[in-house]
Every structure is written in C-alpha cells, then in structure tokens.
A protein has these predicted regions:
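Short, surface-exposed alpha-helical recognition segments that flank or form part
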Residues: 64-71, 129
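Short glycine-rich or small-residue beta-strand-to-loop segments that form or flank ligand, phosphate
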Residues: 92-99
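Short, well-ordered amphipathic alpha-helical segments that serve as non-catalytic structural scaffolds
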Residues: 38-48, 68-84, 108-109
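Condensing-enzyme catalytic core mediating Claisen C-C bond formation in acyl metabolism
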Residues: 1-67, 180-216
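Interfacial helix-loop-helix linkers and transmembrane-helix boundary segments
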Residues: 61, 88-91
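Acyl-thioester C-C bond-transforming condensing/cleaving domain
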Residues: 2-6, 78-89, 103-106, 110-216
C-alpha cells in the first residue's frame, strides 16, 4: 500500500474583532445590569483575583445587543483580507468554533458564511464545546490541508457570552429566594462568570504554502 504524503500547514495571517469600546471594571454593571437592582458583592473579589481591568461587550449600556456572534466572527474573517480583499475568494473551508452560537439551527458556521457572500460556495463546519471549540475548528482546518483535501482554510474562535450574563437572566432565581425569605443574592459560583467572560472573535488563515515574506 502506498503511504500517504502529508503536507505542511502554515498559519499565514491572524486577525481579531472586539465589539465597541473597552468596558472598565467600574462600568460593567451598567452594561450587564444590576441583579435585584443591587451592586454585586462578589464583583470586586473576583476582579481583584483575576487581574482583568477591562473587557468588550457586544452590548450598549442598558443591555441592548449591538452584534451577533456570527457578525463578530465575519468581521474577524474580513480583517484577514483588509489589504487583499479578493483573496477571500480563494478560501476553500470555513471552520468556525464557538460555545455560544446565536441559535442551534442554522449552525454558527453557516450563519458566519452568510455574512461573507464574497467567499462563494465552500465547505463550512461548526465545532462546539466549552473552551475547546476554537481549537477543534483549528484542528479541522489543519487536517484538511495536511491531508491534501484543500490548500487554504480559515479557522475561527468566537464567543458572545454577555447576553447570557445580563441581570434579567438571574431575576427569576432572585425572586424565588425573596419568596422563601432567604438572602436574595445569587450564589458566588453562579455569579463568578459574570466578571470573567467577555465577547470577541479571532480568525486564522491557514495555507499549505508559506508566505513569501513575513511570519509563518
């Protein structure tokens, strides 16, 4: 049996998109909202320990959404081709990983592809899974080039967690605690992620051919 020849794979370009202006620690609840109309007791503890000083939200103050996950991802992909816009037409695979798609169907990758009409009819995949979704997307693109199925791919990782962290998502639980005459504060474990996560997207351009100049 003839042994398969495996190709080299190179990351030839990277890009990212972060929505709106950075939000400082002091302003976070202006965007996410106040649970039970009260400032968080855990916020300063978490922020002191995680060292984060600002983050990005796909929200306006008051919680109005400004970008979908798919829109952010498409903008990161387009940023790969800022100086060479026609090159997006040569991409043969779009591999988009996320833990927080805008909806279950159509898939996240398909929705991103819908925001990239210039890319044409290409293969699209949508890996999911907390923390590892972006790496799954990267590995799929890597293997497709490695095995010679294609020569050029884009892999993305993106999250839009802010919508799930808004105060209105916690109000039902707070009201039940009040009815039970318990301390109406969400447990530390549940509120912890509100002060850890933010929104954004990144994209890698992968190729079986090295850049003639620059990094690979």
């Amino acid at each position: 049996m003839k042994q398969m020849t495996l190709n080299e794979v190179y990351i030839t370009r990277t890009a990212s998109f972060f929505p709106n202006n950075p939000v400082s620690n002091d302003d976070m609840e202006e965007y996410l909202g106040y649970i039970n109309n009260k400032p968080s007791k855990s916020k300063r503890i978490v922020l002191r320990n995680n060292g984060i000083t600002n983050r990005y939200y796909a929200l306006e103050k008051g919680g109005k959404v400004t970008h979908t996950n798919a829109q952010m991802t498409a903008l990161a992909v387009k940023a790969l081709f800022t100086n060479t816009p026609d090159e997006i037409k040569s991409v043969q695979l779009l591999s988009c990983g996320t833990s927080a798609p805008d909806q279950i169907m159509p898939s996240h990758g398909v929705m991103v592809h819908g925001w990239l009409p210039e890319s044409g009819a290409i293969e699209v995949v949508s890996p999911s899974g907390v923390c590892c979704a972006g790496m799954h997307a990267l590995k799929y693109a890597y293997m497709a080039i490695k095995t010679g199925e294609i020569t050029t791919a884009v892999a993305t990782g993106s999250e839009r967690m802010s919508v799930a962290l808004r105060a209105d998502k916690f109000e039902d639980e707070v009201q039940k605690l009040i009815e039970l005459e318990e301390n109406p504060y969400i447990s530390f474990e549940k509120e912890f992620l509100r002060w850890m996560l933010s929104d954004g997207a990144s994209a890698f351009l992968l190729s079986g051919k090295k850049n003639e100049t620059g990094l690979n």
